[in-house]
């Protein structure tokens, strides 16, 4: 088993280059794939089995193109790896989301409120859609379709009136967008894979 890391070997910042390689790689962004290939050969790795999401697996494709024998296993709660029906971790995400919303129903009902929950998922809406289909919420909003806040408010109001406990629940995917709007980012700084941190659309929906 090799150690896990959030570093993308093909795009390593100068400050993150290992000490013994700093003299060799001096650019602001460095591709250390040659070192990865060298280490795999040194370790006698015949097959590499990367387990992860689209970032991990996309680099697995790079190594495959370099001649490494790769067998990829999709593992991401987002369930957003193309070419596969199921990702390890997604069922746990759905289960936990359902448990969380069920735990909050008493609070929502006792105060007769609208409950808005923002869930992970980045650009895919599975983490909001599947729990809603399983009864965790009345409505969900996903990144694949821009939504009109007025329509959502009307639907939630109707759901609330039909509920004897006078509450309704909406699951909002973190990548969801208002009609004509853009994705909401909590932090514009990016991680090693170039992703900015999504977050905040749930708060905006609550305010509306």
Where are these regions (language model features)?
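Accessory alpha-helical/coil subdomains and C-terminal extensions
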Residues: 29-32, 38-41, 47-52, 60-62, ...
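Short alpha-helices
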Residues: 65, 76-79, 86-91
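Short glycine-rich anion-binding loops that position phosphate/pyrophosphate groups of nucleotides
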Residues: 7-8, 53-55, 76, 175-177
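Short gly/pro/ser/thr-enriched loop/turn and capping motifs at secondary-structure boundaries
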Residues: 9, 57, 76-81, 147-149
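Short, conserved acidic/polar surface loops in the N-terminal third of protein domains
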Residues: 12-16, 59-63, 82-84
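Glycine-rich nucleotide/cofactor/substrate-binding loop typically near the N-terminus or early
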Residues: 1-41
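Short beta-alpha connecting loops at secondary-structure transitions
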Residues: 79-81, 85, 188-193
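Short acidic/His/Gly/Ser-rich catalytic and metal-binding motifs that mark active-site loops
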Residues: 10-14, 80-81, 178-183
């Amino acid at each position: 088993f090799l150690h896990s890391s959030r570093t993308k070997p093909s795009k390593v910042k100068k400050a993150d280059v290992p000490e013994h390689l700093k003299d060799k790689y001096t650019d602001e962004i460095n591709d250390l794939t040659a070192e990865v290939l060298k280490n795999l050969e040194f370790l006698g790795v015949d097959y590499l089995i990367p387990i992860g999401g689209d970032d991990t697996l996309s680099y697995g494709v790079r190594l495959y193109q370099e001649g490494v024998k790769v067998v990829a296993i999709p593992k991401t709660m987002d369930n957003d790896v193309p070419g596969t029906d199921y990702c390890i971790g997604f069922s746990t995400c759905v289960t936990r989301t359902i448990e969380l919303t069920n735990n909050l129903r008493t609070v929502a009902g006792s105060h007769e409120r609208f409950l808005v929950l923002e869930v992970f998922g980045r650009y895919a809406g599975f983490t909001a859609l599947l729990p809603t289909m399983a009864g965790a919420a009345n409505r969900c909003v996903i990144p694949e379709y821009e939504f009109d806040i007025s329509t959502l408010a009307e639907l939630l109001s109707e759901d609330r009136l039909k509920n004897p406990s006078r509450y309704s629940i909406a699951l909002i995917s973190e990548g969801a967008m208002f009609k004509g709007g853009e994705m909401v980012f909590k932090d514009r700084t990016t991680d090693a894979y170039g992703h900015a941190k999504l977050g905040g659309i749930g708060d905006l929906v609550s305010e509306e």
